[in-house]
A protein has these predicted regions:
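Conserved E/DxxT/N motif and adjacent residues on the DHp alpha2 helix
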Residues: 57, 64, 179
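ABC-type nucleotide-binding domain
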Residues: 74-325
Length: 325
């Protein structure tokens, strides 16, 4: 457009002053920029509409796990857990994979139970069923005698503290991430939870202390630091049931010891389910359940399972270099 104006005005050059020509170029440049601005805005708007359409489709998807109408809240006083004759399978296209069939497991109140076995044995799936991230097709899962399928999911998950292998931290301060376990906690309670989780020392070394922003998914903290913040959150929540899913498997030796000490504090007085590949993590627990293809093949304390010379003893021997006791 600038070139067009220049050519059109060239024939009458004798009537145009340099100032007028500058003004013409300036106006043309300004108008062109405005059109470019409008064009960019329309492109962004079209992308936003496309993204919104995709999100709407996701939000409109029916919930696979839904509460029954008028479902009561789950109330837990002891933490007794019963998996009774459960059956669970999933379908991928025309293929159906059965994970559990007539599976039974009883965990007494306050008992600490380790789940071990080869990858794909069903360890993590069992914890997800307890958290009701999926519904079983057969049988029932009871917590203190209450069928979790008949209680609200929100009340169920308020009773279970969950510490995964990869800590789930938000792009907020350390204090806010810990307080996610109990939003109305006081600063003193947050600090005490951090102390019990062996996190206070590294937090106080940070320039902003508890006000330090952790970054997206906690990228500004090391793996051991993220895990201790996650444990502090679970301590603050003070739930009667605790689920640990490979909570120390990705840590170095020094961080693992600090996290292991914090977990020992966290497990006191709670019903605990500990999923582990590293058997040293579960050797001190009350019971160890060995799973294979969705079935319990061995069940007992560490010393008994080692003495039996079965699957657990073989796993222990491979991990410890034949040091059995």
């Amino acid at each position: 457009s600038v070139v067009a104006v220049f050519i059109a005005g060239g024939n009458a050059w004798y009537g145009i002053t340099p100032g007028t020509l500058v003004v013409m170029f300036t106006y043309t440049y300004t108008v062109t920029n405005q059109f470019n601005f409008i064009n960019n805005g329309l492109q962004k708007m079209n992308r936003a509409f496309g993204d919104a359409s995709g999100m709407t489709q996701v939000l409109d998807e029916p919930r696979l796990v839904a509460d029954l109408p008028g479902a009561p809240d789950l109330r837990v006083s002891n933490g007794e857990i019963d998996f009774r004759d459960i059956g669970f399978w999933y379908t991928d296209g025309s293929a159906t994979t059965r994970v559990f069939e007539d599976f039974n497991l009883h965990i007494a109140p306050g008992e600490r139970v380790g789940l071990v076995g080869m990858s794909g044995a069903g360890k993590t799936t069992l914890t997800k069923l307890l958290l009701r991230l999926s519904d079983i097709q057969e049988g029932s899962i009871l917590v203190d005698g209450q069928d979790i399928a008949r209680c609200t999911q929100q009340s169920l998950r308020r009773q279970i503290a969950y510490v995964p292998q990869e800590s789930l931290l938000f792009h907020r301060t350390i204090a806010e991430n810990i307080a996610y376990g109990r939003p109305n906690a006081t600063p003193e309670e947050i600090r005490e939870a951090a102390r019990l989780a062996n996190a206070l020392e590294f937090i106080e070394r940070l320039p902003e202390g508890f006000d330090t922003i952790t970054g997206e998914r906690g990228v500004k903290l090391s793996g051991g630091q993220r895990q201790r913040v996650s444990i502090a959150r679970a301590l603050l929540a003070d739930c009667p049931v605790l689920v640990l899913d490979e909570a120390t498997s990705a840590l170095d030796s020094e961080s693992e010891q600090l996290v292991q000490d914090a977990l020992s504090t966290l497990m006191r007085g709670r019903t605990c389910i500990v999923v582990a590949h590293r058997l040293s993590t579960v050797a001190s627990l009350d019971r160890i359940v060995v799973l294979d293809d969705g079935r319990i093949v061995e069940d007992g304390p560490h010393s008994e399972l080692v003495a039996q010379g079965g699957e657990y003893a073989n796993l222990w021997e491979r991990q410890t270099g034949a040091y059995l006791e």
